[in-house]
Design a protein with these regions (language model features):
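Interfacial aromatic "cap" segments that immediately flank transmembrane helices
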Residues: 1-27, 62-86, 98-149, 182-185, ...
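Selective recognition of hydrophobic, aromatic-rich stretches within alpha-helical transmembrane segments
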Residues: 26-55, 81-117, 121, 159-193
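Short amphipathic alpha-helical segments
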Residues: 35, 148, 152
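Membrane-helix interface linkers and caps
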Residues: 53, 59-64
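Juxtamembrane "helix-exit" motif on the non-cytosolic side of transmembrane helices
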Residues: 151-159
Length: 193
């Protein structure tokens, strides 16, 4: 569980940037062209954190450099999701295994400037022998966060204030991003740096 003990503090250390970027991303989710760039920026944030760099504030997600990689991003995501969905149709387990094998492909695409196919191949090689660790780290984080989220949302629902419940959901999504970005940065650093 070293990944959790390193990843969560890394996310907390960069809380303001990750939290602010996530809130900005949620606010721009309905703007198509802009949202693709901000989605790429949010998804590739662990690369900077893996290098022990701090993104220069939450507004970094609006930089043009993220929108210029839209083609590669869509090709990679299309290839990955087609294969993962196809594998999941037959059984859930193959879909999970393939998604774990390619979990580092997006980071490799943008960090090492590989082609989408090479990024998927490299990710498969880097995660070989580490899939259980990645799976259980994600599972433990999801269960732990789920328990905390259910407790907090339960309190707001008991109070009966719908507005506060909606605000709590948005804040919980952003807080989940803080932990998951830190965890993904540690996984990427250990496997690919």
């Amino acid at each position: 569980m070293g990944i959790l003990t390193e990843g969560i503090p890394l996310g907390i250390k960069n809380f303001v940037t990750i939290f602010g970027a996530t809130i900005l991303w949620l606010l721009t989710i309905w703007i198509p062209y802009l949202n693709v760039g901000t989605t790429i920026a949010i998804n590739t944030m662990p690369i900077a954190l893996a290098d022990n760099e701090t993104p220069e504030g939450p507004t970094y997600i609006f930089k043009d450099k993220y929108r210029k990689y839209m083609g590669e991003y869509f090709v990679l995501m299309g290839l990955m999701y087609m294969a993962i969905w196809t594998a999941s149709i037959f059984l859930i387990i193959p879909g999970i295994v393939i998604s774990l094998a390619w979990s580092q492909a997006l980071y490799l695409l943008f960090d090492k400037h590989l082609t989408p196919m090479d990024a998927m191949k490299e990710s498969n090689e880097k995660t070989y022998g580490h899939k259980w660790t990645i799976f259980f780290t994600g599972l433990v984080f999801a269960i732990g966060f789920g328990i905390v989220a259910c407790f907090i949302l339960g309190i707001f629902m008991l109070i009966g204030v719908t507005f506060l419940t909606v605000i709590a959901v948005i804040l919980l999504i952003a807080l989940c991003m803080v932990g998951s970005v830190g965890i993904n940065a540690v996984i990427y650093r250990k496997l690919c740096k």
